[in-house]
UniProtKB/Swiss-Prot annotation:
Record EC number: 3.2.2.6
Protein species of origin: Mus musculus (Mouse)
Stretches that traverse the bilayer: 368-388
Tissue expression per record: Detected in lung, brain, spleen, thymus and liver. Expressed in brain endothelial cells, astrocytes, microglia and neurons. Isoform 3 is predominantly expressed in brain; expressed in hippocampal neurons.
Keyword set, alphabetical order: Cell membrane, Disulfide bond, Glycoprotein, Hydrolase, Immunity, Immunoglobulin domain, Inflammatory response, Innate immunity, Membrane, NAD, Receptor, Repeat, Secreted, Signal, Transmembrane, Transmembrane helix
Protein name, per record: Interleukin-1 receptor accessory protein
Domain TIR stretches: 403-546
Domain of life: Eukaryota
Residue ranges that the UniProt entry lists as topological domain Cytoplasmic: 389-570
Lineage: Eukaryota, Metazoa, Chordata, Craniata, Vertebrata
Length: 570
């Protein structure tokens, strides 16, 4: 056997050498016809000469005295070798113009050449064969054919491809279909039907790789053919539209100064149309970019939706734009089989504002900022500002008004409120601020009529200071008499103002006079330790409500009242 193969090889090389000097039509390596097959599966390959390069078929050529010769070049080799047709079990054989592998092996990968010749004529072509190793899930480097079907558009079928000629029509092979790694059994809208796979109303979820495994017997052996088809669900024809230009549009103006970079995107949406050639291009003043003297760069990008609707973007850019460039007409064009569309970009030169406008804007901005600052300052320090104005520019209310007291203090007669009035309020208002207080229990004479003396004291006072607490609202108390008298005096004569100081919160407001007073008068809240500091907010609010006095009744040397440190101990 070895001697016979050696003699055949010598004969083959002799034939090649004898025709090396003869003219032979060499069609080269037909890379468009690269054949991929799985390892350990049969393969049948027809000589491409009779399919693409010659006008006659094998029978005509054979009857004319032409001989078909096969040889190959191993992968990563340059030496042409004859094909060994004497392998065990006829693993490689030739039948007319077909080369058979039953089955293929990985080392069968290489370039195969079929040559048709006689003594006066020679023609040959080569094609690559790649044997691919199969994994457990049909994934490999093999390129799969793509079958497109319209979304929600009737019933579609795919057929197991490239199985014709492997077995006679009398043989009924078994066929198993898979999606990815999963055998197709009881799928929602996919039904295997032998060599066919039917899709009922295709959906995007049907996208994927579908594999058919065909098993057939031959000469006592079982062979398997594995074929994979990529299914892609695409947009329906009823949704097909002419191009839709998203950008440029009438809402966007590209305003640039000379020397700046001008960038204009032309963004176009194409609905899916089978075999449609989608185009996008720019014109500048009616000319293509290559026909104008402007230094223009155009970059294109394409993206696809799940149903292969296409968004194509062409970005036109000019690095340093000139005034002349800003006067040009830039138009985006688009076309598909449904029609054409175009949209001009709005480009203009930016107007630089005059200098005085900038200065005016800056001045206005500064004014607004100053006003805002003043409003904030007033909001934070309004009490201090009012007290400052009263101290320096206010009119003294105590001159010739016939009043004896600055403040009449009304409060509930119990230990806690009395301590707050006699120690805290009196200590600060009289000793620190110089006001004269009228406190009934301190200033009334023994034996007098309470009602008459109360009304008399209130009429002699400029302010009625009401210390609110839960005990204050009890019916029948002297405190309520003082409140009613003060409110009536304020309403009828207007010669006394009422000041409400909330010493403790009053939840149930049953006294209608007090309820009405709280709705129209400001309530100054005592907050315990936080309010004891004489320069704090509580005392400033109280001072604002007090009568304006130009100078205290006592000099600072006569003040022997409470200091802040003494208030802390109250």
């Amino acid at each position: 056997m070895g001697l016979l193969w050696y003699l055949m090889s010598l004969s083959f090389y002799g034939i090649l050498q004898s025709h090396a000097s003869e003219r032979c039509d060499d069609w080269g390596l037909d890379t468009m016809r690269q054949i991929q097959v799985f390892e350990d599966e049969p393969a049948r390959i027809k000589c491409p000469l009779f399919e693409h390069f010659l006008k006659y078929n094998y029978s005509t050529a054979h009857s004319s005295g032409l001989t078909l010769i096969w040889y190959w070049t191993r992968q990563d080799r340059d030496l042409e070798e004859p094909i060994n047709f004497r392998l065990p079990e006829n693993r490689i054989s030739k039948e007319k113009d077909v080369l058979w592998f039953r089955p293929t092996l990985l080392n069968d990968t290489g370039n195969y050449t079929c040559m048709l010749r006689n003594t006066t004529y020679c023609s040959k072509v080569a094609f690559p064969l790649e044997v691919v190793q199969k994994d457990s899930c049909f994934n490999s480097a093999m390129r799969f054919p793509v079958h497109k079907m319209y979304i929600e558009h009737g019933i579609h079928k795919i057929t197991c491809p490239n199985v014709d000629g492997y077995f006679p029509s009398s043989v009924k092979p078994s066929v198993t279909w898979y999606k990815g790694c999963t055998e197709i059994v009881d799928f929602h809208n996919v039904l295997p039907e032998g060599m066919n796979l039917s899709f009922f109303i295709p959906l995007v979820s049907n996208n994927g790789n579908y594999t058919c495994v065909v098993t057939y017997p031959e000469n006592g052996r079982l062979f398997h053919l594995t074929r994979t088809v990529t299914v892609k669900v695409v947009g329906s024809p009823k949704d097909a539209l002419p191009p839709q230009i998203y950008s440029p549009n009438d809402r966007v103006v590209y305003e640039k100064e000379p020397g700046e970079e001008l960038v204009i995107p032309c963004k176009v949406y194409f609905s899916f149309i089978m075999d449609s050639h989608n185009e996008v291009w720019w014109t500048i003043d009616g000319k293509k970019p290559d026909d104008v003297t402007v230094d223009i760069t155009i970059n294109e990008s394409v993206s696809y939706s799940s149903t292969e609707d296409e968004t194509r973007t062409q970005i036109l850019s000019i690095k340093k734009v000139t005034p002349e460039d800003l006067r040009r007409n830039y138009v985006c064009h688009a076309r598909n089989t449904k029609g054409e569309a175009e949209q001009a970009a709005k480009v203009k030169q930016k107007v630089i504002p005059p200098r005085y406008t900038v200065e005016l804007a800056c001045g206005f901005g500064a004014t607004v900022f100053l006003v805002v600052v003043l409003i904030v300052v007033y909001h934070v320090y309004w009490l201090e500002m009012v007290l400052f104005y009263r101290a320096h520019f206010g009119t003294d209310e105590t001159i010739l008004d016939g009043k004896e007291y600055d403040i009449y203090v009304s409060y509930a007669r119990n230990v806690e409120e009395e301590e707050f009035v006699l120690l805290t309020l009196r200590g600060v208002l009289e000793n620190e601020f110089g006001y004269k207080l009228c406190i009934f229990d301190r200033d009334s004479l023994p034996g007098g009529i309470v009602t008459d003396e109360t009304l008399s004291f209130i009429q002699k006072s400029r302010r009625l200071l009401v210390v609110l607490s839960p005990n204050y609202v009890l019916q029948g108390t002297q405190a309520l008499l003082e409140l009613k008298a003060g409110l009536e005096n304020m309403a009828s004569r207007g010669n006394i103002n009422v000041i409400l100081v909330q010493y403790k919160a009053v939840k149930d407001m049953k006294v209608k006079e007090l309820k009405r007073a709280k709705t129209v008068l400001t309530v100054i809240k005592w907050k315990g330790e936080k309010s004891k500091y004489p320069q704090g907010r509580f005392w400033k609010q109280l001072q604002v409500a007090m009568p304006v006095k130009k100078s205290p009744r006592w000099s600072s040397n006569d003040k022997q009242g409470l200091s802040y440190s003494s208030l802390k101990n109250v």
